[in-house]
From Swiss-Prot:
Its main location: nucleus. SUPFAM superfamilies: Nop10-like SnoRNP. GO terms for biological process: positive regulation of telomerase RNA localization to Cajal body; rRNA pseudouridine synthesis; snRNA pseudouridine synthesis. Residues 22-42 are annotated as: Disordered. It comes from the Eukaryota. This is H/ACA ribonucleoprotein complex subunit NOP10. Belongs to the NOP10 family. Pfam families: Nop10p (PF04135). It is found in: Nucleus, Nucleolus. It comes from Kluyveromyces lactis (strain ATCC 8585 / CBS 2359 / DSM 70799 / NBRC 1267 / NRRL Y-1140 / WM37). InterPro entries: H/ACA_rnp_Nop10, H/ACA_rnp_Nop10_sf. GO terms for molecular function: snoRNA binding; telomerase RNA binding. Non-catalytic component of the H/ACA small nucleolar ribonucleoprotein (H/ACA snoRNP), which catalyzes pseudouridylation of rRNA and is required for ribosome biogenesis. This involves the isomerization of uridine such that the ribose is subsequently attached to C5, instead of the normal N1. Pseudouridine ('psi') residues may serve to stabilize the conformation of rRNAs. The H/ACA snoRNP complex also mediates pseudouridylation of other types of RNAs. The H/ACA snoRNP complex mediates pseudouridylation at position 93 in U2 snRNA.
Length: 57
């Protein structure tokens, strides 16, 4: 089982192990995406983010 979360009315995370809430909303994974040092496309991703001003200042 993986740790999942959903947001409450105040925007705080509510953690659960279920894939769906009682209101039939899909929960989100609480784990970050995997990182690979062998990422072949990181240069292209950074170039696109710079082009469209998506990088933090």
């Amino acid at each position: 089982m993986h740790l999942m979360y959903t947001l409450d009315a105040q925007g705080k995370r509510i953690y659960t192990l279920k894939k769906m809430t009682e209101d039939n909303e899909i929960t989100k994974s609480a784990h970050p995406a995997r990182f690979s040092p062998d990422d072949k496309y990181s240069r292209q991703r950074v170039t696109l983010k710079k082009r469209y001003n998506l990088l933090p200042n």
